[in-house]
Amino acid sequence: QGIILCGLYTGLRISDIALLTWENLDLDNAVLTLESQKTQRSMDIPIAPRLKQYFDELPAGDDPAAPLFPSVYARRIANKTSGPTSAQFRKIMVKAGLAEARTHNTTGKGRGAKREVSKLSFHCLRHTATSMLKNAGVSDAVARDIIGHDSEAISRQYTHIDMAAKRKAIEPLPDIY
């Protein structure tokens, strides 16, 4: 539950969430501070109220270097990849009826054959976080900073504007008939 909430409310990659420790977390100021594994970018991310509530309820130990998600951390360190955690997320989605089980089907033949890519993965939470921020009216610059996107082009690929936001956008248009 915690890694899913963290992905949803921060847009962090699973590799970054897996390596979070208590010293990354400032609950008094509701800020998560880390260095992105992929970009080495230093990030300060405000913690959403629901995610803060989750962290507040976690039993904190005496070691600030202790991982927030010990089993995910151990798997990430042992495997040097977040693949097993991503696969576990997929199984949760299948069990919840939100995704179909992987079939390992390919498209094409011979050297041109490509594995079918799942449309639902942990990375989708990064898209969802970006879209939620944009649909809530957060500026592009602020959304990009929270998610960690360096360019508008990348941010656009992660943004999916919902119909409610589009309807709200056209409400102020004048009636010219």
What are these regions (language model features)?
Residues 97-119:
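Short helix/loop segment immediately N-terminal to the Walker
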Residues 33:
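Minor-groove-contacting beta-hairpin "wing" of winged helix-turn-helix DNA-binding domains
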Residues 37-57, 65-93, 107-109, 121:
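C-terminal catalytic core of Y-nucleophile DNA break-rejoin enzymes
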Residues 27-29, 49:
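Residue-level signal for tight coil/turn positions that link beta-strands
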Residues 1-14, 18-19, 28, 38-42, ...:
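Basic, Lys/Arg- and aromatic-enriched nucleic-acid-binding interface segment
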Residues 6, 81, 114, 118, ...:
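Residue-level marker of regulatory loop/turn positions in helix-turn-helix DNA-binding domains and
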Residues 2-16, 124-150, 157:
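C-terminal catalytic core of tyrosine-transesterase DNA break-rejoin enzymes
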